[in-house]
């Protein structure tokens, strides 16, 4: 996918780096699979901010993605690739032999006209979705389920993938990009290949306004606030905050572990931080 640098005709365009993909559909999305999406501004039902730095941005519509891929044994063909404002990966509109259309996460290297299948008898090729028990060990996969039938939860963003490294009994072992190795039930499904749009990390927005278009508001440093607003706030002149970095609520940050789900610790074979 070509990388486009804009001419510095203004300060806002000087640092912009865009990605150009001529294969993406230029029209409107497939309407039956589009739903309205309301803005929350980071507020809950009481009106209080529960997530900071959210607000504004261009109006978006949600594309309903098929993360379960349960239409087994029915041949399908990719009709077109599309941009999705709700995720970094591209999506593909798939048409099945029975006439139904669904959106899926577009695998890397696939284009309009390519066939895709799902089910235990699906061919071992990029875009096929199978249970982990039917995927060869060593394969690169994405859109991996954590619970059978729940739908894909792992490796869904642009360029993401995991590797199937072992299979023993009821569990398969996968290696995540972070280095973590974890066990997943062999009945969980995954799609062969990597996620599309792997060059997404090379994009540069170029100006603050481009973040605002995406609904992201500015992040103010704690040391620039008043004492009433942040534990690092206040002081005469510029200060370092006077303590180890904490969140606005006093919880240690920058390396502090926050994982609380001890129930699934037994599924993690090796931590991402293990040497």
UniProtKB/Swiss-Prot annotation:
Gene Ontology BP annotations: cytoplasmic translation
Biased composition (Basic residues): 254-275
Gene Ontology cellular-component terms listed: large ribosomal subunit
Pfam annotation, one family: Ribosomal_L2
GO molecular function: rRNA binding; structural constituent of ribosome; transferase activity
Basic and acidic residues: bias regions: 28-38
Region annotation Disordered: where it falls in the sequence: 28-53, 222-275
Gene3D superfamilies, per database record: 2.30.30.30, Nucleic acid-binding proteins (2.40.50.140), Ribosomal protein L2, domain 3 (4.10.950.10)
Keywords: Ribonucleoprotein, Ribosomal protein, RNA-binding, rRNA-binding
The organism's place on the tree of life at top rank: Bacteria
Oligomeric form and interacting partners: Part of the 50S ribosomal subunit. Forms a bridge to the 30S subunit in the 70S ribosome.
NCBIfam families linked to this entry: rplB_bact
Family affiliation: Belongs to the universal ribosomal protein uL2 family.
Function: One of the primary rRNA binding proteins. Required for association of the 30S and 50S subunits to form the 70S ribosome, for tRNA binding and peptide bond formation. It has been suggested to have peptidyltransferase activity; this is somewhat controversial. Makes several contacts with the 16S rRNA in the 70S ribosome.
Protein's UniProt name: Large ribosomal subunit protein uL2
Species for this entry: Marinobacter nauticus (strain ATCC 700491 / DSM 11845 / VT8)
């Amino acid at each position: 996918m070509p990388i486009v640098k804009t001419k510095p005709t203004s300060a806002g365009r000087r640092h912009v780096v865009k990605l150009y993909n001529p294969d993406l559909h230029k029209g409107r999305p497939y309407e039956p699979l589009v739903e309205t999406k309301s803005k929350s501004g980071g507020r809950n039902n009481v009106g209080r901010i529960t997530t900071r730095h959210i607000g504004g941005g261009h109006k978006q519509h949600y594309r309903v993605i098929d993360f379960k891929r349960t239409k087994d044994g029915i041949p399908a063909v990719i009709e077109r690739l599309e941009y999705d404002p709700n995720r970094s990966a591209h999506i593909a509109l798939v048409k099945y032999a029975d006439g139904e259309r669904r959106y899926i996460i577009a695998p890397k290297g696939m284009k309009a006209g390519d066939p895709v299948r799902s089910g235990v008898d699906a061919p071992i090729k990029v875009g096929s979705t199978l249970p982990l028990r039917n995927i060869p060990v060593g394969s690169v996969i994405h859109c991996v389920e954590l619970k059978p039938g729940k739908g894909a939860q792992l490796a869904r963003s642009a360029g993401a993938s995991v590797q199937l490294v072992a299979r023993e009994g009821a569990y398969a072992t996968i290696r995540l990009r972070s280095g973590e190795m974890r066990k997943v039930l062999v009945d969980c499904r995954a799609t062969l290949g990597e996620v599309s749009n792997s060059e997404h990390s090379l994009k540069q927005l170029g100006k603050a306004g481009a973040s605002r278009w995406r609904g992201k508001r500015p992040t103010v440093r704690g040391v620039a606030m008043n004492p009433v607003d942040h534990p690092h706030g206040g002081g005469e002149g510029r200060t370092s905050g006077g303590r180890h970095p904490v969140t606005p609520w006093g919880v240690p940050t920058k390396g502090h572990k926050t994982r609380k789900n001890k129930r699934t610790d037994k599924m993690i074979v090796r931590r991402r931080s293990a040497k």
